[in-house]
Each structure stands twice: as structure tokens, then as C-alpha cells.
């Protein structure tokens, strides 16, 4: 991890959430409208460059088919995990839970995207300081 920069895992997660929102066919599993901005990409074109670069890095050590499969499986894992967690938080709020602790928060955008839930919670995001700057 570079000093003063988010972890690669946090950035990749944001890239994947943005790519899912912009490019995957409906219905969307998870809609993170802030992911593109959080990923550090200034445009959809910049996102494409970053996603293609990541896929090419995997392809260099494996093969293009495996790289594409990895991209798809990582996307599926990230967006389904995010959706599941937010669904569970919604149910917890309805049961009266008042705290949400996000360990390894990375570039999470929950508090900004979900004010209808966040307004009922004390949210604690815990991660390496560089990721949260």
C-alpha cells in the first residue's frame, strides 16, 4: 500500500462497483452511484482504461479467457456481497439496531447513498488511514 493512497483492494472494489452500474445489463444487483468518483476515475472512458489494464495484468500471467472469467467473478462477488450487506443493514434498522461498524471500509459509500438508513445509525468506518483520507 502506498503512503497517502487507498489500498488496491479498495480501489478495485470501487472500480468494479462503477463498472457494474455503467455496463452490466439490468436488473442491477447493486447501484453505487458514487463508485466512479471514489475509484479515482474522472469519466467512463477512464474507468474502461483502468478495467482493461487490470484485466490485461491478469491475462499476462494466465490467459485472456481466465482474465475475463476473473473479472466477471470478482464483479459478481463484490456486488452481491455489497447488496447482501445493505439488505441486512436495512432489516437490522427495522429491528432497532442503531450502530453499523464497517471493518475494512475501503471506499464505501453507504452513508452517502443510503440516508434513509444512515439517518437511524451511528456508522463507524474502520480502515487504514490512507484509505479514508
Model region roles, listed by residue range:
Residues 1-101, 107-133:
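Rossmann-like AdoMet
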Amino acid at each position: 500500500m502506498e503512503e497517502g493512497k487507498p489500498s488496491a483492494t479498495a480501489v478495485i472494489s470501487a472500480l468494479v462497483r462503477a463498472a457494474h452500474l455503467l455496463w452490466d445489463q439490468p436488473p442491477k444487483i447493486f447501484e453505487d452511484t458514487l463508485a466512479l468518483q471514489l475509484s479515482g476515475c474522472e469519466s467512463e472512458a477512464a474507468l474502461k482504461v483502468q478495467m482493461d489494464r487490470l484485466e490485461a495484468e491478469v491475462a499476462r500471467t494466465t490467459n485472456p479467457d481466465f482474465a475475463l472469467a476473473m473479472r466477471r467473478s470478482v464483479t459478481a462477488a463484490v456486488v452481491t456481497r455489497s447488496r447482501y450487506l445493505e439488505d441486512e443493514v436495512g432489516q437490522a434498522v427495522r429491528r432497532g439496531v442503531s450502530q453499523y461498524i464497517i471493518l475494512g471500509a475501503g471506499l464505501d459509500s453507504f452513508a452517502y447513498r443510503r440516508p434513509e438508513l444512515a439517518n437511524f445509525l451511528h456508522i463507524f468506518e474502520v480502515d487504514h488511514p490512507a484509505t479514508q483520507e
